[in-house]
């Protein structure tokens, strides 16, 4: 762990200066239970190195988090006999990020758990309000994004 933000609760958890129910730890990543779970077993996976969000995440930390997420996902499926898993990751306040240390949410999912129905309703309302794009509109947006692609 090279970089720490001493005002960051997730850095404090990674340094064992704040309590957490840890489910997995590697040299560069940590997984612990969310204190506001949407489902039993809802787990957060973080890099131990402080990275604000996906925009700041370095390749080494990203690989460590995804490796840990795969291990924890398999454990969640086995521990809860889950039918599936939702992975959520938010960036910046407008994207729904509340703690500014990169983290991925892993939530075990079950048929008829109600969570997908709420998400599906919101998505359908958004689609109705916006409408589905034409193929030409999709190509225009894709070109706009491609113009800004930069390899690290």
Task: Show the residue positions of the predicted features.
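HIT superfamily nucleotide-processing domains
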Residues: 1-152
